[in-house]
């Protein structure tokens, strides 16, 4: 009887061991319909990306941020020189030969990202070049090494065709109806849905995808690890503060005030900065268009006001400049107490740097909201003079 029980326990232990091993193995691997075994690349923060390495190619699935559970795009990044069954892959998604060497970027964000990855030589064309602030990218555009393909909303298709790009970086939008003639060129479209991630580190982690596309995966991983470390250390410091100042963002554009949604990357960063954002309860992942009266209702008592502006003449932007744009700003407590801080997006690299270096912006938020931490001077925002 004792031997029988011992054998029973032995069998159960062996079965448990194999079940655990099988479960652990399945967490880091995946099989294709054809039986190929791949290694899942763990994404620690990004919710819209899944990447699986199959050796000769990497399968990248981009989830649809507007329709939960649906796929936006599936890519197969095939290393040059590798020979997988491309006809089979093309039936399941878009095949992209990597590393990319001749691309067109429709946003300054992704053009600047290629520069961060030391892959600017792969940038053949670019839209909206008038919004480029990086001196080196400006020079490449001026010299013609990067071709101006016009507006991102109405690009010069003939110029794009002449460039013969191996891929195009575009930002997708909900219900946009596709990419028009650009989407019909037969050139792989990289749908850059990173801006729809709900956290700053989630968006920043997309650098790993762009690293794979450009053959800079090791550099991309290194950059992201450093950003993640910096960001989390800043969060730790902010969480130890005792005050939670109320904060308002941005200002009117025409008759509409676009505020960061409570579920947007900026909204999440403000939470991480240990401030009480006046629209923290909002459920939108992007910007929200509001009339001034609604912002006044919720934000008039905010003690800190951070706003972004463009100064075409690079003149000093003051509280009086702000008031001349709209007299109603005088009703804001932060304005009355001189607690307004501005970022000139024309003269700074705000839009180029922040998407994939959120640690830099988080440092600004914490510096201004919690000066007692003595983090130093802010990088983007300065106090508006009288």
Where are these regions (language model features)?
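A short, structured surface patch at a secondary-structure boundary
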Residues: 67-161, 170-172
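Bacterial Sec-exported substrate-binding components of ABC uptake systems
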Residues: 27-111, 219-247, 336, 349, ...
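C-terminal soluble interaction/assembly domains
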Residues: 279-281, 285-373, 377-385
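Bacterial Sec-dependent N-terminal signal peptides
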Residues: 1-34
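Proline-aspartate-enriched helix->loop->beta-strand connector
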Residues: 149-173, 187, 292-305
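Short, structured coil segments at secondary-structure junctions
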Residues: 119, 185-186, 273, 336
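Alpha-helical, coiled-coil/dimerization segments enriched in small aliphatic residues
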Residues: 258-291
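Extracytoplasmic substrate-binding proteins
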Residues: 145, 156, 166-256, 280-281, ...
